[in-house]
A protein has these predicted regions:
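Catalytic beta/alpha-barrel core
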Residues: 154
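Feature captures the catalytic cores and cofactor-binding loops of soluble hydro-lyases/lyases
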Residues: 157-162
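Intrinsically disordered, low-complexity regions enriched in acidic/Ser/Thr/Pro/Gln residues
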Residues: 1-151
């Protein structure tokens, strides 16, 4: 969000991996470190956070520089010049991607009342963080008490989750 605007902001961000331009991404220019880690995990470029040796976002919030402990091959063949990970954009390069996703097997439940409390808390936090409109939000709850949460928001709904 811009300090003088009540509308959500979107910017074209360049993502460099090991000194090479990997792609351009359209997203809200906030929480870019967290976004980069989630995006790299989601694309299968890294398998865990520890694969990243360093990660820096430039002061102008237009470039993300990531150095990995391993080389990645065929960068230019895997990604389009601009990734639009939100509505109507984005890409999954292969249906094989879905075959590698493991089914979640969990007995975890969230009573309806707890879900309502969590949603209310999420929207209160969102109002404090971003008083404007035109954004999507997502939260990850603390499994123990369902109240502690990490909030993410972005112009693109998929980016809010990443």
């Amino acid at each position: 969000m811009s300090g003088s605007s009540q509308l959500a902001q979107e910017a074209l961000i360049r993502l460099f991996v090991n000194g090479q331009l990997l792609t351009h991404i359209l997203c809200s220019p906030s929480n870019l470190r967290e976004f980069a880690v989630g995006w790299l995990l989601g694309q299968g470029i890294i398998n865990r956070f520890e694969d990243i040796l360093s990660l820096a976002v430039c002061d102008e919030m237009t470039d993300i520089n990531v150095h990995l402990g391993t080389q990645i091959s065929d960068i230019e063949k895997r990604f389009r010049p601009i990734e639009a990970p939100g509505c109507g954009g984005g890409q999954i390069n292969s249906l094989h991607y879905f075959e590698s996703i493991k089914k979640v097997d969990s007995d975890l439940t969230l009573p309806v009342g707890e879900c309502r409390k969590a949603l209310s808390s999420m929207f209160r936090q969102l109002d404090d963080a971003s008083p404007g409109s035109g954004i999507h939000c997502a939260a990850v709850l603390d499994q123990r008490d369902h109240l502690g949460m990490t909030l993410g928001y972005d112009v693109g709904r998929h980016n809010a989750v990443v």
